Amino acid sequence: MERVLIVNADDFGLSKGQNYGIVEAYRNGVVTSTTALVNGEAIDHAAQLSRELPALGVGMHFVLTLGKPVSEMPGLTRDGLLGKWIWQMAEEDTLPLDEIAHELACQYQRFIDVFGREPTHLDSHHHVHMFPQIFPIVARFAAQRGIALRIDRQTVLNADDLPSDLRSTQGFSSEFYGEEITEACFLRILDASAHRGEASLEVMCHPAFVDNIIRQSAYCYPRLTELEVLTSASLKAGIAERGYRPGSFLDI
């Protein structure tokens, strides 16, 4: 059975260092896809780079936890900014869902305006689209537009509630992160997916060169380690040996 592997680099547009790291991991490594924060400080730079790489799949990284929203969100922002208090609001079930749905549509249009095309797929910064209150909004939005969606099936309460026409990979892994940034970890992810019989798999990553913006992130220097592993010749060989075909969300 042919298996499609999508190695998706999150945070395109966050900074120039992030952008250059993703491009390096695509040109000289195993990254096949990326997702862009349309409110990122380097989003225009990301769009410029992507025009030189037409085969790189570029999706949208829906943002509700960082920077300024595209639309007015008085119910979610503090001093005009988004932040991680969204977790507390989700626990208290006080999320402004109408504002979130509107912001999703506005970020989507912003993506089209900047990149000149629709995104290949949707996911989100800090996985907020997997919140039980937010997931139905994003799932319906993706299904209506015929674009794929990152789904962490371990967190979906009821897979039967997914729209029948919603596209996603059969498997998803966020394990290549933090203390587990090794070639062995990456290949274990592939082996586990193959053991489950999944025909398609997305592996999330965050390769980057460190700049002043990345230094402000709690997840800083591990991005350099990710870049080193993702551009290793032995990892590329290990993927090929396992029969995976590199692809993007346009291949599922």
Curated annotation (Swiss-Prot):
Can you supply one Gene Ontology CC term for this chain's record?
cytoplasm
Q: Which InterPro entries does the entry mention? A: COD_ChbG_bac, Glyco_hydro/deAcase_b/a-brl, YdjC-like
Annotated pathway, please?
Answer: Glycan degradation; chitin degradation
Q: What class of enzyme is it?
A: hydrolase
Kindly state which keywords UniProt assigns to this record, in alphabetical order.
Carbohydrate metabolism, Chitin degradation, Cytoplasm, Hydrolase, Magnesium, Metal-binding, Polysaccharide degradation
Cofactor(s) listed: Mg(2+)
User: SUPFAM superfamilies, from UniProt?
Assistant: Glycoside hydrolase/deacetylase
GO aspect biological process, one term: diacetylchitobiose catabolic process
Location in the cell reads: Cytoplasm
Catalytic reaction equation(s): N,N'-diacetylchitobiose + H2O = N-acetyl-beta-D-glucosaminyl-(1->4)-D-glucosamine + acetate; diacetylchitobiose-6'-phosphate + H2O = N'-monoacetylchitobiose-6'-phosphate + acetate
**In the record, what terms sit under GO molecular function?**
chitin disaccharide deacetylase activity; deacetylase activity; metal ion binding
Q: Does the keyword Cytoplasm apply?
A: yes
> Where along this sequence does the record place binding of Mg(2+)?
H61, H125
Q: What is its main location?
A: cytoplasm
Q: Which CDD domains match?
A: YdjC_EF3048_like
The record's annotation in NCBIfam families points to: PRK02134.1
Family assignment from sequence similarity: Belongs to the YdjC deacetylase family. ChbG subfamily.
> Any idea what job this protein has?
Involved in the degradation of chitin. ChbG is essential for growth on the acetylated chitooligosaccharides chitobiose and chitotriose but is dispensable for growth on cellobiose and chitosan dimer, the deacetylated form of chitobiose. Deacetylation of chitobiose-6-P and chitotriose-6-P is necessary for both the activation of the chb promoter by the regulatory protein ChbR and the hydrolysis of phosphorylated beta-glucosides by the phospho-beta-glucosidase ChbF.
Which PANTHER family does the annotation name? CARBOHYDRATE DEACETYLASE (PTHR31609:SF1), YDJC DEACETYLASE FAMILY MEMBER (PTHR31609)
Cite the record's note on assembly.
Answer: Homodimer.
What's the protein here called?
Answer: Chitooligosaccharide deacetylase
Gene symbol? chbG
